[in-house]
Amino acid sequence: AELYGQVKAGRNLPEYLSAKAREFMQAVAPAQMAGLKKRCDDLNIFILTPDSADYPQRLRDLPDLPLVLYGTGNPACLNGRRYVGMVGTRRPTKYGLSACRDLSLTMAERGVVIVSGLAEGLDGAGHRAAVEAGQQTVAFLGTAINKTFPAVNVTLRTELEALGGAVLSEYPPDYTGKMTGTFLARNRLIAGLSEALCVAEARTRSGTLNTVSHAEEYGRPVFAVPGSIYSPTSEGTNELLRTGRARALCTADDVLDTLHIAPGGTELVQEGVMLDELTPNARTVLASWSASSASSASSGPSCRLFWAAPW
């Protein structure tokens, strides 16, 4: 509404508003804007633009950032946390489901916000693992914000919102326009919010690999779970590994260590020493100490670790 007012008043607009967006906003009648705002208020839907305080900071830097995001749940979870994307096929095997669930659960328990698309299959499995851990998770839809697709995930959506997570969409409530390409378009948002993207299981031709392409464009590291050479649903992940587009994902620590994430989703650092300057052995010692100190913090006095690092 603020941006709309600026357009009508003829004031200068932020650079991120393209000419096409300006033209659209100038053509929209004030009554339409007011009606949309009321509809969102009635459905407890929040609206974010790049000028909003809760707009995801990680999306602001994208060349194709969304001008408007509609959301339900808790917008406060969209900033100030550690975010990892978990995606994969909508028709997973038991192996893929188990890998997705175990990896997502471990990362969520470490304070990571799992990001995915609330779709059937591994998207839902990633969100469900975060809910199981009692942690926040963020979902991006390719539909109107007040429509859950598939409908089987309606309960999951309610549960993740109750835990302080959020569901976002570029499409307003009751949107009935063409859906061609909307799910592919939302893939860039999953990749954009994520600090790293994990692929649990995927075929060679799938929307999952579209998300991987966006992650590569945005400079996000990609991880893939190795699969059986006899499984069609692992052909995509194995190809990512074979061509060097992804790193092997065998344990959650493969991602957590790369992102320097300690228990609680905090940055893994040692006073006076940058992590990038430590040897692998030093990182292992520091990670182990961080984990043990976090688990014992509530059971008694703690001590701070100081050493003259020879590495």
List each model region and its residues:
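Glycine-biased, small-residue-rich flexible motifs in mid-sequence functional cores and linkers
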Residues: 41-43, 47-311
